[in-house]
Amino acid sequence: MDTIRMINYVLAVMFFICYAYQAFYILVPFIIKPKPHKPAKLHRFAVLISARNEQAVIGNLIDSINRQTYPGELVTVFVVADNCTDDTARIAREHGAVVVERFNLDEVGKGYALNFLLHRIDAMYPERPFDAYMVFDADNVLETDYIEQMNRTYSDGYEVITSYRNSKNFGDNWISSGYALWFMRESAWLNRPRMRLGSSCAVSGTGFLFSQKVLDECGGWNFFLLTEDIEFTIDNIVNGRKIGYCADAVLYDCLLYTSDAA
């Protein structure tokens, strides 16, 4: 028993050392005020959505993009219907998206789908008209000023930006509530203080932007792990790119609510 207690004590100390700095983060927003934005310039954005059998929700996301306060002529929505067996592609087209369909059971995952979609965009638009790309999951819904707010932070000079990931099903059960609280903590108590301190933030799954310049420097979208968001974050930090955070750009995500889905 003494050995087990000692192991538990050592683990507790290690976790305390690793996470103690986050207690300081709680104070940062009250001590350091956000820097004023630079004058915003208009940029052209491509929205990337990877969807597999998302016919029930894909239309809601595209509609929320079409309702943005940002000029619609500067936003093009692309959907890759990835190994779909339902009407995802048809519904996305009906709501105004440019849709490509992908069928590949050997290379499975969001990273492969995004890589496929970006290659198709290059073929369709060889002149490369887009300044930056935004990535969303098919079950997201955006606040009406989401793109406008992201554009303001992009105009500040950030080449990679993450946003505030909120929940649209917080009250379903304890699992969805737990995920919602985790992502609230990640946005408000990790990325926000890091942004105030001038350090790099972290991309988390959905609701992020990267510039054409970053895509070129990465040699395309070559992030294929199950946690491709973490892989992308680490690649940017290792290569000296600072990831920004836009607290005013809010999206609502349908979070997992069963242990089987996890």
Per-region residue spans from a language model:
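Cell-envelope/extracellular polymer assembly enzymes that use nucleotide-activated donors
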Residues: R44-A46, T76, E231
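Acidic helix N-cap motif at the loop->helix transition within catalytic regions
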Residues: V57-G59, D86-R93, D145
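A conserved acidic beta->alpha catalytic loop
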Residues: A81-A89, N104-D106, V141
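Long helical/loop segments within the catalytic core of UDP-sugar-dependent glycosyltransferases
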Residues: F103-P126, F130, T144-L226
